[in-house]
Design a protein with these regions (language model features):
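Small-residue-rich
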Residues: 1-221
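Acidic, glycine-rich, low-complexity linker/loop segments at the periphery of domains that act as short
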Residues: 2-25, 301-310, 386-437
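Short secondary-structure junctions and interdomain/linker hinges
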Residues: 76-83, 308, 353, 357, ...
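Residue-level marker of positions within ordered structural domains that often coincide
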Residues: 182, 379, 415
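Long, internal scaffold/assembly segments composed of regular secondary structure
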Residues: 214-259
Length: 437
């Protein structure tokens, strides 16, 4: 061993003797977090120390401990207590800034992923189910649905829907298509697809910071109308707070569109009963809404053909309409989503049933059997708390112009959810008397 090495060894030994007088290795154990490996370096346990220095699974702990010791070394070398304190404060501020910057980047880079997972969580919460059958996720960004140039996506989805709807048995057909976010110019296309396959499209309007922006945008390009295919589309308006911001790291709370949780509500609800209002439209798992909508705002949004999402302290976050995009239709059945969904479901049941009867001779026996089955089916879904108020089988006979066709005419009267209560009240002689004392 050369002279320089001996001198270094002597200095190290002197420092060790000083440490022993001050409390030994316990000083380091008291300064450095034990989770970072300092206890593993205690010289009293040579085997533990050796394992810590050589095991591959301890590499991260060794890196953390080295970093801590380097900081401690800098403080010891600072000289006076004042210099050491100033250096510690400077180092702490530097590390705090680095941590803050890293957290900002983490939240920014993982925001889309967080939104996706939180949205799925909201669906399950509002569906009130731990396990859901026949639920499919498409890992496709909104931009792909918005783009009219993405013919491949449109072709593949059309093919997929055909595979499940263009069949004699409709047991695997879809009932909901949920596309969170605003579809822009492509909203019309996806509405037509939903109508074609008797599916309810649930989507959203843009995330606006003030109500006036919604009015201006709708005035410039309205999305509602009277076309039949618009009756299968539900558009929510007003984003909700999924999580409050982390102070000093994020500039704003985390907001999510409400199409997914509303679809969860619709999945678990009664077909004719819309997921709207205080009792049936409460969205679970959110903290409030972007816009504090008033009743006048709600009425205007409803007339725009959208479902306003409101927040009331006693109610929570609530969907406050059952209107479809076909809110300008003269047919009230097309304006209420509960009625649209109920009639679509009934139509699918009838298609499935009559498909199973094809190529049977239509004689008196079969005619009577069909009538019995139809009466039995409609009786099950008729009455309070069910889908329809009444029904009538108006026609069930052979087509006089086509011997291989049978004409079936059924009329149903669905239940409608109450949107307004018109109150007319008066007191004695048409006015309320008020006597001041």
């Amino acid at each position: 061993m050369n002279e320089k090495a001996l001198e270094l060894q002597q200095k190290v030994q002197e420092k060790v003797e000083v440490l022993k007088k001050q409390g030994g290795f316990k000083i380091l154990e008291g300064i450095i977090d034990g989770k970072k490996g300092i206890r593993d370096m205690n010289p009293k346990s040579e085997a533990r120390r050796s394992a810590f220095l050589t095991d591959e699974d301890k590499a991260e702990k060794r890196r953390q401990l080295k970093s801590e010791l380097e900081v401690l070394k800098e403080l010891v070398e600072a000289g006076s207590l004042t210099e050491a304190t100033d250096k510690a404060k400077s180092k702490s501020a530097e590390i705090a800034k680095l941590l803050k910057d890293n957290l900002k980047n983490i939240f920014k880079n993982t925001q889309d992923l967080e939104k996706a997972y939180r949205s799925v969580d909201l669906f399950f919460r509002n569906a009130d189910e731990q396990s859901i059958r026949n639920l499919y996720f498409l890992n496709i960004p909104l931009e792909e649905f918005v783009s009219a140039d993405n013919s491949n996506l449109r072709e593949e989805l059309t093919k997929h829907f055909d595979q499940n709807y263009d069949r004699f048995s409709l047991e695997d057909n879809y009932s909901l298509l949920v596309i969170p976010g605003f579809l822009g110019e492509s909203l019309d296309y996806w509405s037509k697809q939903a109508s074609k396959y008797r599916v309810t499209l649930v989507t959203d309007y843009t995330d606006e910071l003030e109500f006036e922006s919604i009015e201006d945008n709708i005035e410039e390009r309205k999305i509602a109308g009277d076309a039949r295919y618009l009756a299968n589309t539900l558009v929510t308006c007003n984003y909700a707070v999924a999580r409050q911001r982390y102070e000093g790291i994020e500039d704003d709370d985390l907001y999510l569109p409400m199409s997914i949780p509303l679809a969860g509500k619709m999945y678990s609800g009664n077909g004719i009963q819309p997921s709207a209002g205080k009792k049936h439209g409460k969205i679970d798992g959110v903290l409030g809404t972007r816009l504090p909508l008033l009743r006048t705002h709600v009425d205007k949004i409803d007339k725009m053909g959208m479902v306003p999402i409101i927040y009331e302290k006693e109610w929570g976050t609530v969907a406050m309409s059952d209107t479809t995009l076909a809110n300008e239709s003269t047919d009230p059945d097309q304006r209420a989503i509960g009625v649209v969904r109920a009639k679509d479901w009934i139509a699918k049941v009838l298609l499935d049933y009559f498909n199973s009867l094809t190529f049977q001779n239509f004689d008196g026996r079969l005619r009577e059997e069909i009538k019995q089955q139809l009466n039995k089916f409609f009786d099950k879904i008729k009455g309070h708390g069910k889908l329809i108020e009444s029904f009538s089988i108006d026609e069930l006979k052979k087509d006089p112009d086509n011997p291989q066709a049978v004409l079936v005419s059924i009329n149903v009267k669905p239940y409608f959810a109450t949107k307004h209560y018109v109150i007319d009240y008066s007191g004695t002689q048409g006015s309320f008397a008020h006597e001041e004392k």
